[in-house]
């Protein structure tokens, strides 16, 4: 019996370091937390799809800014100090901090911005450097959202764009250009922190904006309920890029399936952990975009959705 106990002890002692060595260590940087981010579970599911089991063959070192963007640089440096095999950053609000923190550790990002225009990489087909991942945008998405809004409410002549200046995207500028073509005045509503939302909506109401287009960012997504509540209070239509917004009361949304795209980020993680170089892995881009229309919201604002537009919708919320 004693021999058996000693043998078991020897097996545990010898194999424990091997098990630890077999684990890939992946840092994760979030704008919120695993509990508050509505899409982080999709990334975890993507890892599971590829055979990764947390605690067995992969260890996730997660750091979340809890909605406080000023914490991101310190958290990024903390993750780099852990010397993980790779770091995953969820969100365009987050990616610049991790890029600034390391130029050697491989980074995979999921961002709703153009990585080239934002200065994250040199090109989508061949990023170069230590960053690759998925981008959730294409060049004409902002223009199409405004176009769909005009088809739904042709009389609209004033809209505002709610955006985060710390999120280096170009949705406001693209909407501004589209507005000039469609005869719509476009107002800028910059929101640097959560406390600015009330003031932004008051400014929109004072300018008699008839609709607000919510630019894509983690900051906006994590504060979706507050934004939809403010829109209802001021009776201003909302338009955004992700289906959950329409489900929460926005008039319409147009964009890719956010969870599916983020889930696919795990493929890049897997390839890099198996030896691929991030700079040689092309950025993935969505090829399918969903139009979701909320008929309840349309009726509440006295709008009739044209049959031609309803027929093109991927989902209609009755």
Question: What residues fall within each predicted segment?
Answer:
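Short hydrophobic alpha-helices and adjacent helix-cap/hinge residues
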Residues: 1-318
């Amino acid at each position: 019996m004693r021999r058996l106990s000693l043998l078991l002890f020897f097996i545990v002692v010898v194999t424990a370091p091997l098990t630890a060595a077999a684990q890939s260590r992946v840092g994760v940087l979030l704008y919120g937390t695993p509990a508050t981010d509505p899409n982080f579970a999709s990334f975890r599911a993507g890892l599971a799809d590829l055979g990764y089991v947390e605690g067995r063959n992969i260890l996730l070192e997660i750091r979340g800014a809890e909605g406080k963007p000023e914490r991101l640089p310190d958290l990024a440096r903390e993750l780099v100090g852990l010397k993980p095999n790779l770091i995953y950053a969820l969100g365009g609000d987050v990616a610049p901090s991790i890029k600034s923190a390391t130029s050697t550790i491989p980074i995979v990002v999921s961002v709703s911005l153009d990585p080239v225009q934002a200065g994250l990489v040199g090109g989508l087909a061949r990023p170069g450097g230590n960053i690759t991942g998925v981008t959730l945008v294409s060049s004409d998405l902002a223009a199409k959202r405004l176009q769909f809004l005009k088809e739904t409410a042709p009389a609209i002549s004033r809209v505002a764009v709610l955006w985060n200046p710390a999120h280096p995207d170009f949705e406001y500028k693209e909407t501004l250009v589209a507005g000039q073509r469609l005869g719509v005045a476009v107002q800028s509503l910059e929101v640097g922190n959560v406390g600015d939302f009330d003031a932004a909506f008051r400014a929109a109401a004072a300018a008699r904006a008839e609709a607000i287009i919510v630019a894509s960012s983690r900051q906006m997504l994590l504060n979706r309920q507050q934004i939809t509540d403010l829109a209802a209070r001021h009776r201003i239509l909302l338009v955004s890029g992700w289906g959950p917004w329409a489900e929460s009361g926005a008039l319409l949304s147009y964009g890719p399936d956010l969870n599916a795209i983020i889930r696919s980020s795990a493929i890049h993680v897997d390839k890099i952990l198996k030896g691929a170089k991030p700079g040689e892995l092309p950025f993935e881009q969505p090829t399918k975009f969903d139009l979701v229309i909320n008929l309840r919201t349309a009726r509440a604002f006295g709008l009739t959705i044209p049959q031609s537009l309803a027929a093109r919708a991927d989902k209609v919320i009755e």
